[in-house]
Curated annotation (Swiss-Prot):
GO terms for molecular function: rRNA binding; structural constituent of ribosome. It holds the Pfam family Ribosomal_L21p. This protein binds to 23S rRNA in the presence of protein L20. The lineage of its organism: Bacteria, Bacillati, Actinomycetota, Actinomycetes, Micromonosporales. This is Large ribosomal subunit protein bL21. One of its GO terms (cellular component) is cytoplasm. Keywords: Ribonucleoprotein, Ribosomal protein, RNA-binding, rRNA-binding. It comes from the Bacteria. It comes from Salinispora tropica (strain ATCC BAA-916 / DSM 44818 / JCM 13857 / NBRC 105044 / CNB-440). One of its GO terms (biological process) is translation. Part of the 50S ribosomal subunit. Contacts protein L20.
Amino acid sequence: MYAIVKTGGKQYKVAEGDVIEVEKLAGTPGDAVQLAAVLLVDGDDLVTDAAKLAKVEVSGEIAAHTKGPKIRIHKFKNKTGYHKRQGHRQPLTQVKVTGISSGK
């Protein structure tokens, strides 16, 4: 059984036991999380009906908090001596999917 969930403005295909990296979620490692925005569930039959999907929940636990790769930003304006250098690392959360409720 797998589900497609939406979190942090992105969609992820998850199954029980998967570890996914999502935008930072509040909580400490070991805390339980519910991914309620389920877009599709496929098990014995495919479910796409919004009324049925409202009952489905994907549960997981926070495995770790990490950072994404370093992104370097360099702004430059010609003939003025203006240089601005900046770096960014996006905070991420690793979530281990522990279950997908069928909502029946």
